[in-house]
Amino acid sequence: MFASLARALFGTANDRSLKAFQRRVPEINALEPQVRALDDAALAAKTVEFRQRVAAGTTLDALLPEAFAVAREAARRVLGMRHFDVQLIGGMVLHAGRIAEMRTGEGKTLVATLAVYLSALSGRGVHVVTVNDYLARRDAEEMGKLYAFLGLTTGVIVPNMPDDERRAAYQADITYGTNNEFGFDYLRDNMKYRIEDMVQRPFHHAIVDEVDSILIDEARTPLIISGPAEDSSDLYRSVDTVIHELVKTPEAFEKDEKFRSVILTDAGAEQVEAMLREAGVLIEGGLYDIHNIAVIHHVQQSLRAHTLFARDVDYIVRGGKVVIIDEFTGRMMDGRRYSDGLHQALEAKEHVEIQQENQTLASITFQNYFRLYPKLSGMTGTAMTEADEFAEIYKLDVVEIPTNLPVARKDDDDEVYLTAREKYEAVSTLIEDIAKTPQPVLVGTTSIEKSEYLSELLTKRGIRHNVLNARFHEMEATIVAQAGAPGAITIATNMAGRGTDIKLGGNVEMRIRQELAEIEDPEEHARREAEIRAQVAEYHDIVTKAGGLYVIGTERHESRRIDNQLRGRAGRQGDPGSSRFFISLEDDLMRIFGTERMGGMLQRLGLKEGEAIVHPWINKALERAQKKVEARNFDMRKNTLKYDDVMNDQRKEVYAQRREYMAADDLAATVQDMRTDIIHDMVARRIPERSFAEQWQSAELAEDARGILGLDLPIADWAREDGVDGHAVTERLEQAALQAQAAKAANFGPSVMRYIEKQVLLTTFDSVWKEHLLALDQMRQGIGLRAYGQKDPLNEFKHEAFQLFTAMLDALRLRVTSTMSRVEVAPPVLDNPFAGVAELHADPHVPGLASEPAPGLMTQPVGSYGAATADIAVATPIGASAIMPDDPSSWGETPRNALCPCGSGKKYKHCHGRMG
């Protein structure tokens, strides 16, 4: 009661925010007459003036009224559109680093131009983030005309662009692109080997369109750049054959749809074990024995593929490939793959070619990528329901912008049926009735399967209609643009983020582009254009009189936002419209999250075949169910972020250090420091503090010096000298290593030596980081089990992640030292050190990275000191044969106390020497 009274007296937080922005609107409007009086050249020259003032110390906030007035006038002249007052408020909200919630059709694209123009005056670049490539290209092309008029440059990032074009696009004042492209460019840049090869510049301001889709719906989706791992195609097929039979027995597994999880029962595990043994997959031991852990993993992923993932709902098979469907937008997600072997399990299930598994080389979530921007803002039609999450995770406040005209849409109460069949029959009947009028209909479904089922029902009734789902995504823009034409009936999977407004009467601009594309005669083109415009205007009046767009939802989504986005397709810019949702007790939301009380009450009402119940109480109950789901999903995203933040802190440190290495001209001191640390570790390990020479492990230390430093030193003789202690041995090792490196540098020449040092550092860094990511991922998967031991999994993860990070840095120092001690340069490089030089090592599976090593830089893996074998490029001494870790015949005579050439880190006598 007190909260209601306070709102009545002081207004809501949103009202107070709006008032603060509204105070500046008259100031902008007052400048309009004098700005309109400027000719085109004088108006464009304002940009130069503004930039000079910013350089002189004027803040962007102080420039806002003038800059907005100039941008509004330029839009009027170039685009034929003038910003409304509410759009000015939207621009201010974006400039303030907040989220502007604007209803569909209120001109979000135009609103963004105000904040984009103002931020671009700083000269530091603005990134405008869209949900798909079509929108990025469209907005860059259309709004680019406005920016060009004002003297600003515009770039657009699309897939498969060469790096030179990407770099040019990022150097532009304004850069359009999808969230995927921006994120992948960030990861690729941090895998480059030269600063000048990077494409992005330091981040400044990102304005995210459909911000809820990107920062909420896709928050837990990591962007991953991966390289090939070992091929397990045969194992996937064998396991799939077993699981295909197993899922016919419901008692063999337990499925939890609410949490999207499935496990084998004891009976199921016994059945799988017997079937795998019969198939020859399980050769020894039980299913859960440690040496069969890979088989368990394949079984679990295959079980998930068969029980939790449905064809035409979660994915489709297209062109012999399994393509993921975005659960929020219904679009195909080409290029994306499920990780951890799940995608391969789906390929085995669908009997298509199984692609090779990948190992993560670099990854980041959208949550952490967008938090890299010093300034972040966004816009969407539906954000208020997730305002708490935006505030808590991104520190972004949501401001609801009032519509320019009152919303005239009529939202009817839901109709609830007992079965899905009755529900779809009722929907078909309603569409059949509306089809007798000019009123257009948009029907929203939750999957391809359901959209095609409804399409069949309408076809049987002889009702003409269009279907928009992932199968027909090429026709998306055309279908959506004409969904408001008289009599149009459109069935669409999730309409979220479609980006094209449904205009009553049809989209005149798109019709002109499509129908007049091949007409070259100017007079004929003008005549036909006038006819189309007149016809669309007539159609607009017809549809308006018929009641506007009728939106039908065939199922409630887990998120209220998706429902609101579907409703919001009707009633844009004050147009009339209607919406109604049809629901059944068999729908996923009702079946999984609905209350037993609701189902019991509907059963007691004794509904007959085809009857529905319509009551506001039902709507409230459904909203409560949706809120429960939203709260659960928020908790899951928040929990994921806590773990991801641990890795994110490490990622930022690694990328910053790597960038320092790339930018440095001379890394000799860094390499020397690493070598010194390794020598200190070696000596401390073999010569205990305050020990006698008889207690030293002199032979082992000599082997370490040979294996790691490439030095054959008389350490046993040193031990017999008077007055020699561990410190003296350390100094002698350091001096010997320094002299060896100095001799190499003199032999190679300074330029080649500096080049090799940088390449060895970068490639080794990439190698240990890749292994570290794998270790973190494996630890993350099992860390939740620590809760059974009364330990906090998050604290355990933080502690062990730090230990792994420390071990990674130790491995980096070791491998760099070992590699630099053995690297040699073949004669062709000595003659011409930079002839055809490319990166020493780069993964050929990472787009945009060089994959050929420099001519003459040969490779030989080296043994490690307490770490895994290096997989980086080092050189075999000239005249020596290469030692191959997997080929014992290439090892020659190996001393029994030396490190094993296989790279295990063990002594030869305890490794392959023992087996020999």
From Swiss-Prot:
Main location: membrane
Pfam family for this entry, one: SEC-C
GO MF annotations in UniProt: ATP binding; metal ion binding; protein-exporting ATPase activity
Entries under SMART domains matching the protein: SecA_DEAD (SM00957), SecA_PP_bind (SM00958)
Membrane topology classification: Peripheral membrane protein
UniProt record, GO biological process: intracellular protein transmembrane transport; protein import; protein targeting; protein transport by the Sec complex
UniProt entry keywords in alphabetical sequence: ATP-binding, Cell inner membrane, Cell membrane, Cytoplasm, Membrane, Metal-binding, Nucleotide-binding, Protein transport, Translocase, Translocation, Transport, Zinc
Protein name: Protein translocase subunit SecA
Taxonomic source organism: Gluconacetobacter diazotrophicus (strain ATCC 49037 / DSM 5601 / CCUG 37298 / CIP 103539 / LMG 7603 / PAl5)
